[in-house]
Each structure stands twice: as structure tokens, then as C-alpha cells.
Swiss-Prot record:
PANTHER family: TRANSMEMBRANE PROTEIN 248, TRANSMEMBRANE PROTEIN 248-LIKE. It comes from Xenopus laevis (African clawed frog). One of its GO terms (cellular component) is membrane. This is Transmembrane protein 248. Belongs to the TMEM248 family. Disulfide bonds: none annotated. Residues 82-103 have a biased composition (Polar residues). It comes from the Eukaryota. Keywords: Membrane, Transmembrane, Transmembrane helix. The keyword Acyltransferase does not apply. Residues 82-106 are annotated as: Disordered.
């Protein structure tokens, strides 16, 4: 018995007789391609972990919204180049282990964490600088000023910037005015443990050895968050005769929490298996359409209306 197949005719008749099934095949094919592409994406790209809402990149970027005012009216505090952390705080080295067990140290008091960060000081025209060597800038803020929410929004945070070199009025005298300066400072944040992220920390700096000045002078600054600029009680003379400081943190890819490679491989495997199954389903339906063609019921119904059949029935 010879089987005569007409694949193109069968395929055309299959498409014309079963359009819903054809649409289903196209949809399944699209899903298979989408799963295959998504699986390749998970395999080749590093994906940020959706379960970790805040890492150190996000935390340090919050300080970019702060404006620090260094005013001429502030008093200087002089101290020698020999400082030790207070007994009530934990040093930055101890803070590394504290982030791993935040519940155990939640009530242990504030801790110090020191990281390197960029600070720009933009003096306004009336600002004449300081005759003393300024090596430290300090400020006190609350969590809501950097966008923290919930209980953390009411937490008090002390920030101290240790400059690598002294900042004074010598350059102001040379140029006739004070120009903008950019420092890579050692920023020390003192706050309770629950304020800090529990992810991998950035490299720590040591404020006690960061500055090369022998005589240190600390000046206290006032901080203003970005939301205050749009408030009705905004004061345009907020930092008159002063210098405005801005913090800038450059994104560090090593601080972003990503999905582990094993998990990404498992996700890729599941997506690949699903796409292969869908492809097999589509290929099976396509082969059936090529071989079977138009449904048998339709062929029988048409054959009943052939002229020969009608003539025989009349006879």
C-alpha cells in the first residue's frame, strides 16, 4: 500500500479548518522562544537579588541627597592627632562581624563604620575660608533625612568626614576667592546597628591615620535633605557666608547582592526544560498537520455532495 502525502496541501487545509489551534501553536512557540531567551539571560547576566531591598550601594547613595553647610559662624574644636573611639561605640573593624548578626547586637549601642567617599565643598562668594587647618567636618542627621522609613527614620546618626589634607584659606588668598575643592574623605557614620545594611560592606578606612595634618580642627555643620529645598519654609540664605558640601558615592558592583551562580544555573535549567517541552509540543502538532491535513469529518461531509453520490442516490 502506497501512502501519498501532500504536505503543503495538508498544511493549508489544516490552517484553514482549525484557526484557533493555529493561534494556539503560534502562542506556544512564542512562549518557548521567550523562555529560551530568558534562560540564556539568567545564565549569562548577573541578576540583583530581589529579596535584598537595601545594600551598601543604596545606603551610601542616600547621602547624595544631603546638603552640608560649613558656615563661618561655626566654632572650631581643636584636638591633637591622637584619638580613640569612645567606649560606648564599636570600632569599624568590629562592625564587620556585627552586620552578620544584627539581632544579637541590636541593643548593644551605636557602632562606627568608616568608608571612603567623595566630598565636594563649594564656597559661596562671601565665604572667606578659615585660617586654621580644617581636617574634620561633623554633622548630626536623622534617618528620614536620607530617606529611611519606619523606625529607622527617627534614628539619630552622627557623620564625621576626615579630610586627607587640611582645608584652609591659603588658596582663597592666592586666588582672591575660595574655589571648589574635592576631597576623597573617610566618612564615619555612628548609629545603631539596625540602620546599616546587613550585606557585604565596602572597604573600611581608618580615620585616625587618614589625615596627614598634625593639628586637627573639627567644625560642626548643619545638614539639609533634598526635600527641604521644595518646602514652603525654604530659606534661600540658609548657608550665607558658608560653603555647601555635597557627598558623592560611586557605585561599587561588588557591593550589589546578586543571585548566586548555582541558583541562576537552576533557573536556567528549568526555563530550558520548559522551552524544550513547548517546542516538542509545537513540532508534534505541526507534523500532525502535515500528515493528517483537513479533519476527516469535513472530508466525509464534502464527499456526500459530490455529483456521483447525488446521481446514485436519485437512481
Amino acid at each position: 500500500m502506497i501512502l501519498n502525502l501532500h504536505p503543503l496541501e495538508n498544511l493549508k487545509s489544516y490552517i484553514s479548518s482549525r484557526p484557533p489551534l493555529v493561534i494556539f501553536m503560534v502562542s506556544v512557540s512564542g512562549m518557548a522562544i521567550a523562555f529560551l531567551t530568558l534562560g540564556y539571560f539568567f545564565k549569562m547576566k548577573e541578576i540583583k537579588s530581589p529579596g535584598m531591598t537595601e545594600d551598601w550601594n543604596i545606603f551610601l547613595l542616600r547621602f547624595n541627597n544631603l546638603d552640608l553647610c560649613v558656615s563661618e559662624n561655626e566654632t572650631l574644636k581643636h584636638f591633637l592627632n591622637e584619638t580613640t573611639p569612645p567606649e560606648s561605640t564599636v570600632t569599624s573593624g568590629q562592625a564587620r562581624s556585627s552586620t552578620q548578626t544584627p539581632q544579637a547586637l541590636e541593643d548593644s549601642g551605636p557602632i562606627n563604620i568608616s568608608v571612603a567617599i567623595t566630598l565636594t565643598l563649594d564656597p559661596l562668594k562671601p565665604f572667606g575660608g578659615y585660617s586654621r587647618n580644617i581636617t574634620h567636618l561633623s554633622s548630626t542627621i536623622f534617618g528620614h533625612q536620607i530617606g529611611l522609613s519606619g523606625r529607622d527614620s527617627h534614628e539619630e546618626m552622627n557623620i564625621t568626614f576626615t579630610l586627607p589634607a587640611a582645608w584652609n584659606s591659603d588658596d582663597c588668598i592666592v586666588h582672591g576667592h575660595c574655589e571648589q575643592v574635592v576631597f576623597t574623605t573617610c566618612m564615619t557614620v555612628t548609629a545603631v546597628t539596625n540602620v546599616f545594611p546587613v550585606t557585604v560592606q565596602p572597604p573600611h578606612c581608618i580615620p585616625e591615620t587618614y589625615s596627614n595634618a598634625s593639628l586637627w580642627y573639627k567644625i560642626y555643620t548643619t545638614a539639609r535633605d533634598s526635600g527641604t529645598k521644595n518646602a514652603q519654609d525654604y530659606n534661600p540664605f540658609w548657608c550665607y557666608k558658608g560653603a555647601i558640601g555635597k557627598v558623592y558615592h560611586a557605585l561599587n558592583p561588588k557591593l550589589t547582592v546578586i543571585v548566586p551562580e548555582d541558583d541562576r544555573s537552576l533557573i536556567n535549567l528549568h526555563l530550558m526544560d520548559t522551552s524544550y517541552f513547548l517546542f516538542v509540543m509545537v513540532i508534534t502538532m505541526f507534523c500532525y498537520a502535515v500528515i493528517r491535513g483537513r479533519p476527516s469529518k469535513l472530508r466525509q461531509s464534502k464527499s456526500e455532495f459530490l455529483p456521483e453520490k447525488v446521481a446514485l442516490s436519485d437512481a
